[in-house]
Design a protein with these regions (language model features):
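N-terminal amphipathic/basic-hydrophobic helices that include classical n-h-c signal peptides
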Residues: 1-4
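Short alpha-helical
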Residues: 56, 88, 107-108, 185, ...
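Glycine-rich, phosphate-binding/catalytic loops in enzymes
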Residues: 96, 168-172, 222
Length: 223
């Protein structure tokens, strides 16, 4: 989900930042980073230092972590995390024996995740900049690489605008908003399918907002 400026509404891949938004983003970048501690469902503790522009682990992170742990040890299988944010789920998967790749549209998230992974002897995790979005933003291999994965997961954007936390800046708020004209779930599934990056026996885990019902999700998957 590549966010940025656009010349017209038809080409828009994300919200246009106002001068106030840019100023707020710069102020947050100057502020002191937060020390964040998070406990995974299996009891493991993770400690990270996050700038105010990177989404911290929350309840939705814990929910997705539970689903990932149910898949069992990675045993060398490949997984891709889209929108890695803090990088904590990628690190958890690495500790579970997965060969991990990850991507994010936020360069600050990439820097934070790389730093945490390096400090936890997981610098073999591959992190790329980018994510699902219009073809004009680049091809899928830009953010997925050329590998085929046994698992692809994403804690997808679904937070309502009035639920944003002051911890976040405009860049990360943009990453939490589904602005795709066809719906980000549909777009992501289509790009995963057409690019053939998920093995035929692979698993995809995507969190979605409460506004989706089961029939709608089944219809999207069937397409």
């Amino acid at each position: 989900m590549n966010k940025g400026f656009a010349l017209n509404n038809q080409n828009m891949s994300g919200p246009i930042f106002s001068d106030d938004s840019v100023e707020r983003e710069l102020e947050l970048l100057k502020s002191e980073a937060n020390l964040v501690k998070w406990q995974a469902p299996n009891g493991e503790m993770f400690t990270m230092t996050l700038p105010h522009t990177v989404y911290p682990p929350r309840e939705d992170t814990f929910f997705l972590a539970k689903c990932l742990l149910k898949l069992g040890p990675g045993k060398g299988r490949r997984c891709l995390e889209i929108g890695t944010g803090s990088g904590v789920l990628s690190l958890m998967c690495h500790r579970q024996g997965w060969r991990v790749s990850a991507c994010d549209i936020n360069p600050m998230a990439i820097a934070s995740a790389k730093n945490m992974l390096l400090n936890n002897q997981a610098d073999d995790v591959i992190i790329r900049e980018g994510g699902p979005g219009p073809s004009s933003d680049g091809d899928v291999q830009q953010w997925s690489g050329s590998e085929k994965y046994d698992l692809i997961f994403w804690n997808m954007p679904y937070v309502r605008i009035n639920e944003f936390d002051s911890h976040l800046g405009p860049m990360e708020e943009a990453a939490l908003t589904d602005t795709s004209s066809q719906g980000l779930v549909s777009l992501t599934l289509m790009q995963i399918n057409t690019s053939n990056i998920l093995k035929s026996s692979g698993v995809g885990l995507l969190t979605v907002g409460e506004h989706f019902d089961l029939d709608e999700l089944l219809s999207i998957c069937a397409e």
